[in-house]
Amino acid sequence: MSGSCQFLSRETLSSSLGWIPLINALREIFTENVVCPTRLHYPIDEDNPSSTANNILLIMPCWIPGKFLGVKQVNVFPENTKHGLPSLSSHYLLSDATTGCHLAQLDGNELTSRRTAAASALASSYLSKEDSTSLLIIGSGKVAEKLIHAHCSVRPIRSVRIWNHRFESAKSLASRASKELPSIQIDAVPIQNLENAVKCSDIISSATLSKKPIIVGSWINPGTHIDLVGGFTPHMHEADSKCIQISNVFVDTRKGALHEAGDLLTPIKEGLFSPNEVIADLFDLCNNKHSGRSQLKNPAEAITLFKSVGDSREDLAAASLAYKVHNKSS
């Protein structure tokens, strides 16, 4: 691991990070000895009383002793969408953990969206029914787009519905995804038809920055798997408290989800859910300490819910895989 620092673009990451290899890399890193300090989280407008923005700076370091060292900077500016700009901008720096030499700078947005979707698919491989054929995507951003491909890589999905509070955005994503996955029926859901779409879906995957619940617990049918991706602060909510109450809850990491996920912290504060009710995290699943849906009482009818807030070991797994694949092929 030597030489000049490379730049791995969005296009390079897209070609280097196939879904199954990436999912397997995530599965493996949750079994390894990884140093993963707490993510640093800074509300950058906190000291500006005149600002109504909720802009956030995230710093996420991680390393495997003797192998790779990485750090990601993420800037979250939710109001950017009003100006036609991305709400999330990031970059990743990968280094040699033995020498400290920089190996590669990677497009952080592509890295984040791909590893996030892959983590959801990894969880789904344990938690959704193996014969799941219908997928509902809530949201229409970059992560939502990746979630379609990731979920379809682990389950025999035949139909995908996309819902967004801006219908035209959902239609645009449906059009793009249909061209990329021509064998799958992909449609946009009219804004008023969300409840019916939820009731008709085997897997529901939500990737929004919503501060108000979108998914209502009373809409959920037995056997459904719910994947909550978007909310990564205590003030964000994609599902109501009833949805958490009726579900068998799994998380990416207990430390992260129980500290940052509003979808869990709100029902905990309301006395409707306890941290002890989290059944397992990705460490448990990947190390065979819990088998997921198959270990639940009445697996066919169980409602499963996976809440993720992101973890820096996922970035390191994706970045190191991309670096190795790119250098093997170049």
UniProtKB/Swiss-Prot annotation:
Q: Where in the cell is it found?
A: Cytoplasm
Q: Which segments cross the bilayer?
A: none
Is this entry keyworded Cytoplasm?
yes
Q: Which GO terms describe its molecular function?
A: catalytic activity
Assign the protein's first listed, main location to one coarse class: cytoplasm
A GO CC term attached to the entry: cytoplasm
Q: Which keywords label this protein?
A: Cytoplasm
- The question of whether Magnesium is a record keyword is answered with no
Q: InterPro entries this protein is in?
A: NAD(P)-bd_dom_sf (IPR036291), ODC_Mu_crystall (IPR003462), ODC_N (IPR023401)
- NCBIfam families from the entry? PRK06141.1
The entry sums up its family as follows:
Belongs to the ornithine cyclodeaminase/mu-crystallin family.
The name this protein goes by in its record:
Uncharacterized protein P11E10.01
Q: Which organism is it from?
A: Schizosaccharomyces pombe (strain 972 / ATCC 24843)
